[in-house]
A protein has these predicted regions:
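His-Asp-centered metal-binding catalytic motifs of divalent-metal-dependent phosphohydrolases/nucleases
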Residues: 1-2, 30-40
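Divalent metal-dependent phosphate-bond-processing catalytic cores, especially two-metal-ion Mg2+/Mn2+ enzymes
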Residues: 2-4, 42-143
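An active-site-proximal "capping" alpha-helix that borders the catalytic cofactor pocket
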Residues: 6-19
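Hydrophobic alpha-helical packing residues
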Residues: 13-16, 34, 124, 131
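Inter-helical turn/loop segments and adjacent helix faces that build the functional surface
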Residues: 20-24, 111
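Alpha-helical scaffolds flanking conserved acidic
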Residues: 25-33, 49-55
């Protein structure tokens, strides 16, 4: 997501599909599914694409969970200049866990997505608990 607009992502995706000789109707369906995935701005797909949309959505959300999701959260926060944690502002990477990551498990759309999300969600919960415990022990401001 960093460094790309919605339009530039779509252009890049179309270029890749053109090079792979993906037929235009399939390209349109892929773009529609991609647009349906966003956590905050997703738009519903046509009924005939809802299975594909559910699978891609779960895969995207699973990427944001677990150990890799934790790493991605702090990498993104660092790229945006956010502190790891600061009790004086909600503009910090740890807040993203409360705002979004810890809610992902309940939004899974497929049985397999729900199954995989259980373990990754537990990793997130354990990390946040341990982070807060250490923060309270150290009581330092991290940057």
């Amino acid at each position: 997501k960093l460094g790309y607009t919605k339009e530039s992502r779509q252009d890049l995706l179309c270029q890749i599909m053109d090079e792979a000789k993906v037929p235009r109707p399939v390209q349109a369906a892929v773009l529609e599914v991609v647009e349906s995935v966003s956590f905050t701005t997703g738009t519903p797909c046509r009924p005939e694409l809802q299975t594909e949309s559910a699978i891609v959505c779960d895969a995207d959300r699973l990427d944001a969970m677990g150990a890799i999701g934790i790493a991605r959260t702090f990498a993104y926060g660092g790229a945006k200049g956010r502190p790891i944690f600061s009790p004086s502002t909600k503009e910090n990477s740890l807040q993203h866990f409360e705002d979004k990551l810890l809610r992902l498990k309940d939004g899974m759309k497929t049985g397999e997505g729900r199954r995989l999300a259980q373990t990754r969600h537990a990793v997130l919960v354990q990390f946040v608990e341990e982070f807060k415990k250490e923060w309270n022990e150290e009581n330092i401001e991290l940057c």
